[in-house]
Curated annotation (Swiss-Prot):
Organism: Oleidesulfovibrio alaskensis (strain ATCC BAA-1058 / DSM 17464 / G20)
Gene3D superfamilies noted in UniProt: 3.30.1440.10
Entry coiled-coil feature ranges: none
GO biological process per UniProt: translation
Disulfide partners: none
Name used for this protein in its record: Large ribosomal subunit protein uL5
SUBUNIT field: Part of the 50S ribosomal subunit; part of the 5S rRNA/L5/L18/L25 subcomplex. Contacts the 5S rRNA and the P site tRNA. Forms a bridge to the 30S subunit in the 70S ribosome.
GO CC term (a single one): ribonucleoprotein complex
UniProt-listed PANTHER family: 60S RIBOSOMAL PROTEIN L11-RELATED
Function, in words: This is one of the proteins that bind and probably mediate the attachment of the 5S RNA into the large ribosomal subunit, where it forms part of the central protuberance. In the 70S ribosome it contacts protein S13 of the 30S subunit (bridge B1b), connecting the 2 subunits; this bridge is implicated in subunit movement. Contacts the P site tRNA; the 5S rRNA and some of its associated proteins might help stabilize positioning of ribosome-bound tRNAs.
InterPro entries in alphabetical order: Ribosomal_uL5, Ribosomal_uL5_bac-type, Ribosomal_uL5_C, Ribosomal_uL5_CS, Ribosomal_uL5_dom_sf, Ribosomal_uL5_N
Stated family: Belongs to the universal ribosomal protein uL5 family.
Domain of life: Bacteria
Length: 179
């Protein structure tokens, strides 16, 4: 069991149950998965860029990244159906908890001029999406060896029914939201 899982079970779960008046511990919102996505528009022309992104995302997540392909052809983007356009990873279980711990305690504080995350990333159902401009904030990547920094989307999927429950859960776990 990871450090963050212990915090959830021992500190966050009792507070959640009290705050939202849940009758059973099975009603408590919990983390289901974390999805990491790098979208590369230039990947259709530059295969080396895509291979580099897959290698870097695999290093960040600790799990092999899957190449995403275009669902539709779009002529103005010179894109054909089935062309590679990015990569993604879905984390669950212990690797999800480890990644969230690393994100909150190591990666986000390394962002330049970091003052907290805006809470606008909630989708209405308790899930939170966060965009990162440079993926070099993660400790697994050496800034000198990365040729071109890439942006990245991180989606934290919870079993919460509302944004209020989801934000409360992430806040108690230690997500650095703006005050």
């Amino acid at each position: 069991m990871t450090r963050l899982q212990n915090i959830y079970r021992e500190q966050v779960a009792p507070v959640l149950q009290k705050e939202f008046n849940y009758k059973s511990s099975m009603q408590l919102p919990k983390l289901e998965k974390i999805s990491l996505n790098i979208g590369l528009g230039e990947a259709s022309q530059n295969q080396k860029l895509l291979e580099e992104a897959v290698k870097e995302l695999t290093a960040i997540a600790g799990q092999k990244a899957v190449i995403t392909r275009a669902k539709k052809s779009i002529a103005s983007f010179k894109l054909r159906e089935g062309m590679p356009i990015g990569c993604r990873v879905t984390l669950r279980g212990d690797s999800m908890w480890d990644f969230l711990d690393k994100l909150m305690n190591f990666a986000l504080p390394r962002v330049r001029d970091f003052r907290g995350i805006a809470d606008r990333g909630f989708d209405g159902r308790g899930n939170f999406t966060l965009g990162i401009k440079e993926h070099t904030i993660f400790p697994e990547l050496e800034v000198d060896r990365v040729d071109n920094p890439k942006g990245m989307n991180i989606t934290i999927v919870t079993s919460a029914k509302t944004d209020k429950e989801g934000k409360f859960l992430l806040d108690k776990l230690g997500m650095p939201f703006k005050k």
